[in-house]
Amino acid sequence: MAKVYWPYFDPEYENLSSRINPPSVSIDNTSCKECTLVKVDSMNKPGILLEVVQVLTDLDLTITKAYISSDGGWFMDVFHVTDQQGNKVTDSKTIDYIEKVLGPKGHASASQNTWPGKRVGVHSLGDHTSIEIIARDRPGLLSEVSAVLADLNINVVAAEAWTHNRRIACVLYVNDNATSRAVDDPERLSSMEEQLNNVLRGCEEQDEKFARTSLSIGSTHVDRRLHQMFFADRDYEAVTKLDDSASCGFEPKITVEHCEEKGYSVINVSCEDRPKLMFDIVCTLTDMQYIVFHATISSSGSHASQEYFIRHKDGCTLDTEGEKERVVKCLEAAIHRRVSEGWSLELCAKDRVGLLSEVTRILREHGLSVSRAGVTTVGEQAVNVFYVKDASGNPVDVKTIEALRGEIGHSMMIDFKNKVPSRKWKEEGQAGTGGGWAKTSFFFGNLLEKLLP
């Protein structure tokens, strides 16, 4: 038999450019009095801007300014960031993590795209099964879903739910309470999916969209996955009408223009500033297959201004009015999805099966609807954060809040915060430190901070 010789290809060939020109990350705390400068230089590659922004936002850092340039083969960014209290980033663990993940040994694309959810300090979710739910929103839905899981002796380790345009998207990370391992029995998974779908079918009367439950084997970043679920559900097609409490401070203005000289489409976003705004916009553009070549991000008080120079991945710009309108609607939806006005409720208790079901049941019994929710577990402690409104979508009165405190305050740590919507920046011209967006992470509220070493 004649020998056949094949050319040898080094499996690391694709990473050759990165090894020859490794990424460079520097943390500068001397150039600016008010913030920390994070400078990233690396070989350009698809999705790299989202990867970097994702790392910074997962650490609950606020991006106050940014300058992006990635035209050609090199990617050069400068981010002005502060911590949750508006101070420079001085924590050595945070700085080391940024340098490690974004630096030569970080391989950000590999580690961040496979993380099972947003980073929770040094804590991991462990072995788990991911459940994704998209359905029409209604009062008590989250309570019914969590009750089904509790009856099946399935524990919710972490979860996040958003609502927008009468729809709810939710990602839950669960495990078997008896083994603390992922639920992998086919019959049990089938039963769980069937029972959840039965709950969701009750939401879809007189609605042209379908509810669905899926068991995810992927591990996309949870915030990005929620954006993707809403985008696939075409939530941007519905007309968004904010209520009076929300509209007084949050109406984004988005324009799309053409840059003849360089052949870019230029997107300008002007809106009220809030945490993770840049992530939501960059995430949406990336998932719509647009590449950001240049960008300038700035914020002043409660106002944010962001400018992006983009092309589609096929090299085309936004030439038709239909394309421009679609991008504007999708960005508006991405901005609105994370908006939550009114009372936030933070609860901390020993983790157990049925805890989420119990808390959401109590909220429902008090006539409250959950507009946004986050659940995480630190050791044996579960931390739940809920943004609530009454069943009609109106702000919750103080009497209801006090009744909640009296009913559940004896069995778990509880903290209420009222996020008063700030006035439009052009009317106030002041920083939104009094009302506006609280300097509190969605997952890292005061209660969780007490648990961390």
Swiss-Prot record:
Q: In which tissues is it expressed?
A: Expressed in roots, cotyledons, rosette and cauline leaves, sepals, style, and pedicels and tips of young developing siliques.
MF term (GO), any: amino acid binding
Show the GO cellular component annotation of the record.
Answer: cytosol
What protein am I looking at?
A: ACT domain-containing protein ACR3
The record's SUPFAM superfamilies line, in alphabetical order, gives: ACT-like
Repeat listed as a keyword? yes
InterPro entries found in the cross-reference section: ACR1-12, ACT-like_dom_sf, ACT_dom
> Record keywords: Repeat included?
yes
Ranges for domain ACT: 37-112, 130-212, 266-341, 344-423
Instruction: List the source organism.
Output: Arabidopsis thaliana
Query: What triggers or suppresses the expression of this protein?
Result: Down-regulated by abscisic acid (ABA).
- Role according to the record: May bind amino acids.
| Source domain of life | Eukaryota
Keyword entries, A-Z:
Repeat
